[in-house]
Amino acid sequence: MTDIKPYRHKYDGAYCTVDTFRHLLTGNEARAHLDQMAEILKKGAIYVLGLHLLPASGITSSVVRWKNARGRLNVHTTMTVLDIDRKRRKETLSVSLRVHSGNSKHKIRSVYKLRTYTLRQLRSLIRRTGRFDILSTYDNLYDLNRPITPDNSTEDIILLLRKTS
């Protein structure tokens, strides 16, 4: 995400959703990613950036669960916030998958370090790049007919960015 090679042609759009951006653990890595994305996009191109924000009052839930099934395949997912260090801007997240398919059962657990962003910190980062304007913002339902006005309580945000230079 920080070693994007230039291509022969520039692109009209790109996306980075589902919180992937927060795997960039330093401000320098985040800035490098945005700068490199700007290099491969045409002027006026769209970049969709989606991530989880840290609200001023803290997160509303430290555990999120969901399950999905298709035929004989069942997947149960549990995401648990293990720690948030506001000073260092680090979150420790555990993701557990329980997979059942017929007689087969698997359990997978991963622990990730993620960078935290408040709304102010995210806006500041984008402004400092000088390469993108925020066109509109959405929640994680991605409904283009329902833009949101984020505030300090916003937890999930999708930014529709336009490359300016």
Q: What are the residue ranges of the model-derived segments?
A:
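Adenine-nucleotide cofactor-binding loop residues
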Residues: 2
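A short acidic, Gly/Pro-enriched loop at the edge of an enzyme's catalytic core
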Residues: 5-14
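Short aromatic-enriched loop/helix-cap "lid" or pocket-rim segments at secondary-structure transitions
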Residues: 10-11, 59-63, 148-149
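A short His-aromatic
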Residues: 22-24
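A short glycine-rich, Lys/Arg-flanked "PGG" loop and its adjoining helix->strand segment in the class I
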Residues: 29-46
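SAM-dependent methyltransferase
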Residues: 48-124
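C-terminal lobe and adjacent flexible extensions of AdoMet/dcAdoMet transferase-like proteins
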Residues: 113-165
